[in-house]
Design a protein with these regions (language model features):
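Hydrophobic/aromatic pocket-lining and membrane-interface residues
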Residues: 3, 125, 136, 183, ...
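Short intrinsically disordered, low-complexity coil segments enriched in acidic
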Residues: 1-4, 11, 44, 223-224, ...
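Bacterial Sec-dependent N-terminal signal peptides
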Residues: 1-28
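Intrinsic low-complexity, intrinsically disordered segments enriched in polar/basic residues
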Residues: 1-6, 40, 164, 168
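N-terminal, post-signal peptide beta-strand-biased segments of exported outer-membrane/organellar beta-barrel
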Residues: 21-142, 146, 205
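Active-site-adjacent bridging/hinge elements
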Residues: 15-18, 94-98, 254-262
Length: 364
């Protein structure tokens, strides 16, 4: 039951992230073919413009994109029991009245991915000079991604007495400011080339991973759920706040060897604000005019690096939770072997598995 709840929690978080991103998604890649679009240089630095421009601060260009190999309709479905008392029109793919085949057909057999980008142009200008067209742009960019293995959805939908090799679950996010300087020019009558140099000023980065997740439920004597959880945040002034808590069973020993007590991350703190990382990138592009009707263009984007500092890392103290039932357990009070004692033991195990321990700065 605990394992089912944990799985459903992860799926719910994934679904909410997907819904939030899908609501704001506006894919503007079609602007690649619109010559009047002033920001085409963001898609290919070789593209120029027929006129000079200055953007309205902040409101000049707002772009949000979202893409993935599964969508809202794969998670939220029509309820086959709709019309019955208490049943709503829509439900999730985990509804027991939806067949496993129908519930899982929208998910990739390998990794299922969702990625998104939000780009807010703060200031931008384009002008003709120095034998070509030039652009200057200051923008705030945020990108995020999520990878969910097929086995996670399978486990959530159809938990049974078998072993599940779920694999790796990961979520990541990056936020940074970008100062970009671009120049494009005609090389020949038919060939135009351009380049853009970008300076990247990191605001923050976060990575959450659950590696090597397994749920071994085939055994008759015990069930085991395992996985290594890691949370790493790179942000100026960011720290994890830890506290000491007591186990329910005073004799329980923590993974660090402390009896009756354990340290765990309880909160986070950001002391001040500053540069969390620095990087540089280069865009290269070209456009070739075959004739008045046909043009061929190509671009290579974001060739560069980003180096983050203050990489604060936390991991789960223990990578395994073992449930071996309630054998030889009494309901009444007494020393050892009672139902309450067993529940306390499982609760303490779960605390070791689910809570994070501060590991400090992991380095660049």
């Amino acid at each position: 039951m605990i394992m089912k709840i944990l799985s459903n929690k992860y799926i719910l978080s994934a679904s909410l992230l997907m819904l939030g991103g899908a609501a704001m998604a506006q894919n503007l890649n079609s602007a690649y073919f619109t010559e009047a679009y002033h920001y085409r240089h963001n898609l290919n630095p070789a593209f120029g413009d027929s006129c000079n421009f200055v953007s309205i601060p902040v409101l000049g260009n707002v772009n949000a994109t979202m893409r993935g190999n599964f969508g809202y309709q794969d998670v939220v479905m029509k309820n086959p029991m709709y019309g019955q008392p208490g049943q709503k029109r829509m439900t999730t793919f985990m509804n027991p009245y939806i067949s496993t085949g129908d519930a899982l057909k929208g998910f990739n057999k390998g990794d299922n991915k969702i990625v998104g980008d939000v780009n807010l142009t703060i200031l931008a200008a384009g002008f003709k000079a120095w034998g070509g067209y030039n652009t200057i742009e200051l923008s705030e960019k945020t990108n995020f991604g999520m990878v969910l293995p097929y086995e996670l959805f399978e486990f959530a939908k159809n938990t049974g007495n078998r072993n599940y090799n779920i694999g790796d679950v990961s979520l990541r996010a990056r936020s940074y400011a970008e100062l970009a300087l671009g120049h494009s020019r005609q090389i020949t009558e038919k060939l135009r080339m351009g380049a853009k140099l970008k300076f990247l000023l990191g605001v923050g980065a976060a990575d959450v991973e659950l590696k090597d997740m397994r749920a071994d439920l085939a055994g008759t004597d015990q069930w085991v759920i395992s996985g290594q959880g890691t949370a790493q945040v790179s942000m100026k002034g960011f720290t994890y706040k830890s506290k000491e808590s007591e186990y329910k069973d005073p004799s329980h020993v923590s993974p660090e060897g402390t009896q009756g007590k354990y340290q765990h991350v309880d909160d986070v703190d950001v002391d001040g604000f500053g540069l969390g990382g620095f990087g540089m990138a280069l865009d290269l592009g070209a456009e070739y005019k075959i004739n008045d009707d046909w043009r061929v263009s190509a671009a290579v984007m974001d060739l560069g690096f980003m180096n983050w500092s203050n990489n604060m890392k936390a991991v789960n103290a223990k990578n395994q939770f073992v449930f071996n039932g309630f054998h030889d357990t009494t309901v009444g009070s007494g020393s050892g072997g009672t139902l309450d004692d067993k529940m306390d033991s499982y609760g303490d195990q779960l605390s070791d598995f689910a809570n994070l321990k501060d590991m400090g700065d992991a380095g660049s």
